[in-house]
């Protein structure tokens, strides 16, 4: 029985999908069609009768449901988004994440803008 539970979709993932369907007023059949999966497949996931789909399908579900950021759905699925893997492997990142937990929303927005400016400057430097 334990192995069955291990392969079920996590509750947070299911909740995000169901909430997204409610907000977008989209049926299971419509979501399945737009995400490129069968309604039966999606129903089994949402009813905890099947494990998670591929990362590509998870991202597609998030896009169809306008879940922002779409990476949130991957995280709720227990997966690390590919774009985050390289960043998280840098030794400075854990210290940065710990420090940001204490910032106000305003300071967090300033930090994001600074990081984006640094990234843009770095990208331009590599383009030369």
Question: Could you describe each region identified by the protein language model?
Answer:
Residues 17, 31-32, 42-45, 72-73:
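Conserved hydrophobic/aromatic packing and binding residues within compact polymer-binding modules
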Residues 1-26, 110:
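A short, Lys/Arg-rich alpha-helix, primarily the initiator
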Residues 56-72:
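DNA major-groove recognition helix of helix-turn-helix/homeodomain DNA-binding modules
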Residues 36-53, 60, 75-79:
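Recognition helix of helix-turn-helix/homeodomain-like DNA-binding domains
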Residues 27-32, 61:
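Short alpha-helical "recognition helix" segments of helix-turn-helix
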Residues 78-128:
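Interfacial/linker helices and their anchor residues that mediate assembly or domain coupling
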